[in-house]
């Protein structure tokens, strides 16, 4: 603003003033009047030229004065070909800072490359096996840089733990097979509407599916959701925590090439006895032979696809299949419930035909043959299925009667554990006193004295 005000003040000094000749007579002839007009126009043009020259010289002097005194903080660009472009001190300072930042970035990048390209240390044996590079050639140097860079990012791409599940329990408490189930669009379906907001539906037959198969399998929920959003849903599906053995969330997945993969090799289980049921091909891309592909459930209340898988899963567990992968591979690309029902019916028909053949041949004691049962025989799978259904009915009855009590006891134990940790951190004297009292009660209890 200062330079503009000075400039306009100087320009006002050189403002052209109109010049009119004095006329002595009021009335003149037409000839003298035209001659006077010509003279006046010439004088006016000369005055304008002088004013222009004076104005340009005054403007230049004003700009020089402003530049020399450092009063102009705004960049000014003159006419082309009339001197260099003016750059303010602020812009010069910014350019200097940008140059420092650029060279600093180059220095840090170069230093990082030199550091990452150093020879492997004694604690990098595994990395050296994956990316062997023992020399100092540019290729070896670059291989070490690439190896350490990949190792750095793998911390965020690999699952949170090398063993996602604890070691299996000893016999007879363990389950010989592990069933890995997805959550979204397999067991539940969530949708959002303007009227109701978010709502989550449970798939038909889900309670029976989880409860019945938990007698054969170690049921593991492996979801793409994070733990904070998945846990409330799991608590609704299995409120008494009797069917689901473990829950694995997004933190346990593997991120590779933009895909979220459920790598079963991290489960700490024998893959020959692991079955995954999922709706997303990316999930089983590492172990496709262990997967049963399902179409996403869209909320149909009459759906029976999930319950239709029970006979096949039941057959695998009852027959103690050593490796589930060949069995699952034989069902790929087929409707599993219908295909299994067809195969089982074929076995049942063959068994009945053999029984009829023996019956026709006459297996009476008169001819020295063995007696044939009057009732048609049953498949082993049918006999075991009847037993398991009866056991599940008893289990379901027990859970319905004692489930709320079990849940209250579990919550009380959790609250006691939280209190114990708090007291141990802030009131260790109280914890020691409680332990002494418990020991004294155990020593002087009637049961202890009787045993002695």
From Swiss-Prot:
InterPro entries: FCP1_dom, HAD-like_sf, HAD_sf, TIM50
CDD domains: HAD_FCP1-like
Pfam families: NIF (PF03031)
GO cellular component, one term: TIM23 mitochondrial import inner membrane translocase complex
Major subcellular location class: mitochondrion
Membrane topology: Single-pass membrane protein
SMART domains given in the database record: CPDc
Chain ranges of the FCP1 homology domain: 172-316
Annotated localization: Mitochondrion inner membrane
GO MF annotation list: ATP hydrolysis activity
TM region(s), chain numbering: 100-117
Any one biological process term the GO annotation gives: protein import into mitochondrial matrix
UniProt region (Disordered), positions on chain: 30-55, 433-452
Mitochondrial intermembrane compartment spans: 118-452
PROSITE patterns: FCP1
Subunit structure comment from the entry: Component of the TIM23 complex, at least composed of tim23, tim17, tim50 and tim21. Interacts with preproteins in transit.
Record-given protein name: Mitochondrial import inner membrane translocase subunit tim50
Organism: Schizosaccharomyces pombe (strain 972 / ATCC 24843)
């Amino acid at each position: 603003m200062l330079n503009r005000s000075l400039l306009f003040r100087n320009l006002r000094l050189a403002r052209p003033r109109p010049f009119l000749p004095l006329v002595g007579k009021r009335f003149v002839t037409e000839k003298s009047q035209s001659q006077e007009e010509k003279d006046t126009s010439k004088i006016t043009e000369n005055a304008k030229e002088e004013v222009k020259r004076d104005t340009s010289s005054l403007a230049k002097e004003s700009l020089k004065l402003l530049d020399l005194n450092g009063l102009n903080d705004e960049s000014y660009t003159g006419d082309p070909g009339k001197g260099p472009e003016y750059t303010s001190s602020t812009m010069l300072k910014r350019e200097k800072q940008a140059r420092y930042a650029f060279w600093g970035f180059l220095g840090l990048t170069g230093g990082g490359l030199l550091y990452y390209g150093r020879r492997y240390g004694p604690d990098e044996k595994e990395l050296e096996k994956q990316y062997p590079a023992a020399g100092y050639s540019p290729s070896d140097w670059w291989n070490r840089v690439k190896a350490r860079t990949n190792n750095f990012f793998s911390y965020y791409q690999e699952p949170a733990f090398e063993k996602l599940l604890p070691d299996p329990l000893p016999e007879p408490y363990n389950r010989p097979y592990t069933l890995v189930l997805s959550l979204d669009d397999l067991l539940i379906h969530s949708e959002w509407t303007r009227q109701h907001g978010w709502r989550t539906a449970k798939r038909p037959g889900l309670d029976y599916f989880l409860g019945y198969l938990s007698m054969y399998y170690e049921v593991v929920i492996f979801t793409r959701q994070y733990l904070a959003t998945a846990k409330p849903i799991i608590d609704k599906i299995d409120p008494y925590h009797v069917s689901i053995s473990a829950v694995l969330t997004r933190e346990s997945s593997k991120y590779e090439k933009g895909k979220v993969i459920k790598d079963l090799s991290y489960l700490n289980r024998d893959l020959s006895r692991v079955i995954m049921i999922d709706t997303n091909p990316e999930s089983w891309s590492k172990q496709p032979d262990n997967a049963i592909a399902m179409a996403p459930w869209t909320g149909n209340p009459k759906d029976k696809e999930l319950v239709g898988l029970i006979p096949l899963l039941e057959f695998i567990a009852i027959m103690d299949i050593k490796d589930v992968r060949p069995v699952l591979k034989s069902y790929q690309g087929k409707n599993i419930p219908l295909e299994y029902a067809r195969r089982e019916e074929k076995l049942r028909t063959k068994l009945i035909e053999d029984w009829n053949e023996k019956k026709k041949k006459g297996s009476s004691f008169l001819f020295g043959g063995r007696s044939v049962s009057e009732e048609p025989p049953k498949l082993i799978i049918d006999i075991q299925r009847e037993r398991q259904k009866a056991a599940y009915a008893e289990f379901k009855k027990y859970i319905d009667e004692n489930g709320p009590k079990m849940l209250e006891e579990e919550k009380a134990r959790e609250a006691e554990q939280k209190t114990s940790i708090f007291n141990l951190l802030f009131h260790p004297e109280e914890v020691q006193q409680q332990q002494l009292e418990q020991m004294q009660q155990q020593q002087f209890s009637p049961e202890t004295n009787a045993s002695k």
